[in-house]
């Protein structure tokens, strides 16, 4: 084997799991969880997470369009898993806001907003993020807007059930598909390998 490409199934580089794996592949000086053996070899080619790549933006816009009926009267919420630390969360939200800007500029949606759950952070942090999302949905509904929820989650069967439970009782439409299930994700991998 001349080259082995490592594709992390993560939508963002701003989390401790990605940092630990980067450490293992000798791309990060400090480990996140455990000081383990480092794989220092030119055979391994590490591909950065999809983040706000053009293909990620296109996929998420397609997922919003799939559940849209009248863009001018709809708001789109993009929900990310989110990291543990607040510093990483700031960086993650920059990525998410780039995606939101792309969707706004390539559609007629009334508004596009990004949120992170910080699903593995402390309960108080996660609860605060959920409350912010719920309040945004309530306010949008009171303004007569239809609320569409999409995500940059990788799979379609991860924390989506938790999101549905967290938003129970609110009026919204959720496209729970993940980036991995879209045919363009394979194109992104192929493009990343040839860069």
Language-model region placement:
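Extended amphipathic ligand-handling, pore-lining, and cofactor/metal-binding catalytic surfaces
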Residues: 1-195
